A protein has these predicted regions:
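Conserved alpha/beta core of the MobA/IspD/sugar-nucleotide pyrophosphorylase nucleotidyltransferase superfamily
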Residues: 166-251
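N-terminal glycine-rich phosphate-binding loop and ensuing alpha1 helix
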Residues: 2-49
């Protein structure tokens, strides 16, 4: 099985323009993400997928495989789909370009189920919410699955709502995905024909396009507490963590 890791990277972010190139201890953020991916032995190849020449040039300067893609994509999954049309593989793993501290074992968790079950089409990760504030935070997608870990719904609301009991462990989405080529083809063709699916559009959660259309998304629980860089303040947190790890000799 040929497995490719793909890191979508946009320069034009509404909250933090240019963040893939933000400096972290002398290297652009995208370099840190890429190097975490290289530690995943199951990944045969890793690419950054971008529509920006500045990111392309930074990748080339830092020895990073890069694929130029259209600037018309509405989602990162659409960008992965274009890569799939250009580079053949049996499995594509979507790794977010704004999580430079993402652990290799977390990435592996999205891959391993495919090696044990060849009927799987899509995997996604989830982690238990430890901070109660995140349960009511609309920026945090909550995951609801059945007993087999198949996704039933994802929402930015508090769900399930604790009307009768608060004895429930809430989970949030970790944005690492595994896609078979056929699943990516469906996602892209649906988008070209219909645009975003109804619930996907309302919640603004990409994976709902699959769930709304009957695809089974296998969720895997991980113990992940990585820091996503959405703002300059997040970047400062990551810089501090990296600096501390370098001093401790753990990087």
């Amino acid at each position: 099985m040929k497995i490719i890791g793909v890191i979508p990277a946009r320069y034009k972010s509404s909250r933090f323009p240019g963040k893939p190139l933000a400096d972290i201890c002398g290297k652009p953020m995208i370099w840190w993400v890429y190097n975490q991916c290289l530690k995943v032995k199951e990944l045969d190849e890793v690419y950054v997928a971008t529509d920006d020449v500045k990111i392309e040039e930074a990748c080339k300067q830092n020895g990073i495989n890069v694929v130029m893609t259209s600037d018309q994509h509405k989602t990162g999954t659409d960008r992965i789909g274009e890569v799939a049309r250009k580079i053949e593989a049996d499995l594509y793993v979507n790794i977010q370009g704004d999580e430079p501290l993402l652990e290799p074992e977390t990435i592996r968790a999205a891959i391993l189920p495919f090696l044990e079950n060849d009927t799987l089409q899509i995997t996604n990760l989830m982690t238990k919410i430890k901070d109660p504030v995140e349960v009511v935070n609309f920026t945090v997608p909550k995951v609801i699955t059945n007993k087999e870990g198949i996704g039933i719904y994802l929402t930015r609301s508090t769900a399930p709502y604790p009307k009768g009991s608060i004895d429930y462990a809430y989970y949030k989405q970790v944005c690492v995905y595994g896609f078979k080529p056929e699943a990516l083809q469906f996602y892209c063709e649906y988008g070209q024909t219909y645009g975003k699916a109804k619930i996907e559009s309302i919640e603004d959660i990409e994976i709902l396009r699959f769930i709304e259309n009957g695809y089974k998304v296998q969720y895997i629980e991980v113990d992940s507490d990585t820091v996503a860089v959405d703002t300059p303040n997040d970047l400062e947190k990551v810089r501090k963590i990296v600096e501390d790890r370098k001093k401790a000799g753990t990087i």
